[in-house]
Curated annotation (Swiss-Prot):
Involved in regulation of length and mediation of adhesion of type 1 fimbriae (but not necessary for the production of fimbriae). Involved in the integration of FimH in the fimbriae. It comes from Escherichia coli (strain K12). Keywords: Disulfide bond, Fimbrium, Signal. Belongs to the fimbrial protein family. The gene is fimF. This is Protein FimF. Disulfide bonds join C38-C78. Residues 1-20 form the signal peptide. It is found in: Fimbrium. GO terms for biological process: cell adhesion; cell adhesion involved in single-species biofilm formation; cell-substrate adhesion; mechanosensory behavior; pilus assembly. It comes from the Bacteria. GO terms for cellular component: pilus; pilus tip.
Amino acid sequence: MRNKPFYLLCAFLWLAVSHALAADSTITIRGYVRDNGCSVAAESTNFTVDLMENAAKQFNNIGATTPVVPFRILLSPCGNAVSAVKVGFTGVADSHNANLLALENTVSAASGLGIQLLNEQQNQIPLNAPSSALSWTTLTPGKPNTLNFYARLMATQVPVTAGHINATATFTLEYQ
């Protein structure tokens, strides 16, 4: 019985200390799961843009270009929450004009040229540009969407040397 006051004192101290160390804090976690962006249609995942045959003599000065060749990227389906997209192109930049896509350097390659990529309004799309430098293109939510682009050759040096035209670019999509 002599230990009873001791045990009561220990229990009282434990309750007092545990309440003194307790803190009332609340963490609220919020989020939102939105509808999907868009899927790139199979026909737009790996494709070739044919810039056709062009005569080296038509590139008589730096900046001379060929006629534009259209190509498209099909997004299907697009989610109901998506309203716009930014499309950026990345690849190896031409050493004389960083906004142009460089030609692959092979034995049979043409030289003195780069590939210019253009948007639907035929304004140049800067190669390897940060997202902040790209403009939004409006999409129709819940529907397939077609994004139209153009490509053409541009002289970066004269004279241009005849040969094969090959280059590779990757496109990236950012949705709003």
